[in-house]
Amino acid sequence: MFINRWLFSTNHKDIGTLYMIFGAWAGMVGTGLSILIRAELGQPGSLLGDDQIYNVVVTAHAFVMIFFMVMPIMIGGFGNWLVPLMIGAPDMAFPRMNNMSFWLLPPSFLLLLASSMVEAGAGTGWTVYPPLAGNLAHAGASVDLTIFSLHLAGVSSILGAINFITTIINMKPPAITQYQTPLFVWSVMITAVLLLLSLPVLAAGITMLLTDRNLNTTFFDPAGGGDPILYQHLFWFFGHPEVYILILPGFGMISHIVTYYSGKKEPFGYMGMVWAMMSIGFLGFIVWAHHMFTVGMDVDTRAYFTSATMIIAIPTGVKVFSWLATLHGGNIKWSPAMLWALGFIFLFTIGGLTGIVLSNSSLDIVLHDTYYVVAHFHYVLSMGAVFAIMGGFVHWFPLFTGYTLNDTWAKIHFTIMFVGVNMTFFPQHFLGLAGMPRRYSDYPDAYTTWNTISSMGSFISLTAVILMVYMIWEALASKRLVKSVPLTTTNLEWMHGCPPPFHTFEEPVFIKSPQL
């Protein structure tokens, strides 16, 4: 029965598929919003109206991409599909809670869209800083709807995190230890811990903002003894772990893809990779104020946050060089998924280097709120998280559907996307160094050339997105069945065929040797 299978689902594979479809749909919305932004900035002068509507679009673009595209696909889609298969569990620990985690997202998305349709919309930026987000600068229901939307998405993520942690710790067969689980499983577990620890702080912050707006409290209002800087601390204590939440599952996927297409049976430096991810997770919690170098902190505070931020580069470097070492001496297969993984390693590293630049508090004073920051985080998200998602998608597509994508189209798609995102975001480094500020719908003529090039790049990326939709349709219409999958002994998820049966691992797996 359709309703029983898709609305009341308790099957990790079906819920994973729902997350994938929802994330893809939200991704289209987010892409549309980003095209609006680049159309507005394609030449000087106004296109859409005033800066309020522009900032509503920017804010919605960020929220949609983060909470309704990257997280649902990476954690909800790939996590649900792969974690139980990789550890040999029959399903997730709490299958009905899993269903609830998913179904909290569509209403959350609805609230976010509603926020932009009432009053003037929430033009606050994704950070929702007061006093701009207060009830004077943003009278009306828009910001309140946005806050409720975040609450729902947050509850969804917390429930999902509890589910993943329980599943990964308790549902492995007795024979395998935590240090024999695949790296993607590790990455999801660490991500879940980060979610569990950071989201309640965001919930507290936005709830205080809600009461400031509606119940006359003054948590963030100096007139009543409050402090808007407190909100920034609460927000970024969530916001910084959040960016690692967005990338960590990608690290896990890239490890699998690189290992698989290098023909290796395990990644280079498995334990180093695990420790690196745990270090990144831990350090992610103690660097939040590097987003606040411009609020007037003590020099010793700035010194600490600068050095702590730079330390994160070390475990990140361990990961990058371990991926390169995994490639070394391998029998490399230049499949589309491998191209995405190699693109990820290269572009994520560039994004990491600009991150090191921004971690210097003195430099950040100059570069804060310029397009240099936009370029930095889009290199790690738009070419890190998204490339990992695309690589994981083309790699596991045969597992999810039982059909194969057209290899040539997939490679063309990668090439167009690669050119598009680089043409969009590389020029933004120059704009930022030249002092162009973020979150403005217009700019002095001096910035025209790079903005025009950047906007052209965004339309190239749009072409790639449309091509991807065609590619998926072509694969599902042609129904080319998967012949055989190599290397199944070291990649448990493929063991049951493509696609795997509705129920897998109904009894614990038997492990012959201590090594997985």
From Swiss-Prot:
Residues the entry annotates as binding Na(+) = 40, 45, 441
| Positions with a binding annotation for Fe(II)-heme a | 61, 378
Catalyzed reaction equations: 4 Fe(II)-[cytochrome c] + O2 + 8 H(+)(in) = 4 Fe(III)-[cytochrome c] + 2 H2O + 4 H(+)(out)
Kindly list any coiled-coil regions of this protein: none
Covalent cross-link site, 1'-histidyl-3'-tyrosine (His-Tyr): 240-244
Kindly list the biological process annotations in GO that this record carries: electron transport coupled proton transport; mitochondrial electron transport, cytochrome c to oxygen
- Primary site of residence: mitochondrion
Annotated protein name in UniProt: Cytochrome c oxidase subunit 1
Q: Which organism is it from?
A: Geomys texensis (Llano pocket gopher)
The lineage is: Eukaryota, Metazoa, Chordata, Craniata, Vertebrata
Q: Which gene encodes it?
A: MT-CO1
